[in-house]
């Protein structure tokens, strides 16, 4: 199947118009006229992922994170972005990314995470433009739910970090896959007992937790960014297989979390 026809199908699943203003998803590398028979799905485009695409005979990588997330001002092979781009191009591997335009769709990244964690009765948290999903679980202690989350997600160095009383009982959970501290003020005003997201910074998390301790607001759970978004790959694979029968879709086996180990103190 021609890449340009695949892109048309991708855009029907993940409309480019739904991306955040700052985001740059879409075709990163490749030519629309090239033939694609096998697609590798991944969270990131790293050297290992490109090598996996080559070894599995994949002509296209569909990643969640754009290959040039922070922009690129040169692609010399002395730098990792240039070296990775050159490796992919030399082996005829194209790269396409679906980022924020995939986050908030039905079956998208955040919904996939909420479903994986066992949340039911999913709705959009008001005031967050549908970015944060609210759901319910049978009443459970914060500690036991954190343990459940740890079992549901792939193992990573950071584990599952939690701020709150371990014995607190929770039933309403707000979720945002990826970096979510910009939504802390909105979640604080909600009926959630717990907010699960990634990349929480020291000061926003500290202020939120102190306020919650006074007001009875939500507890916090910080899960690894890669682990939170990895669960979407199986959902994306199923959607693509239902839409496109002529192409084989496989999920990457590479863990692209940047951290390799932690020393517990």
Predicted regions and their residues:
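Hydrophobic structural segments
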Residues: 1-265
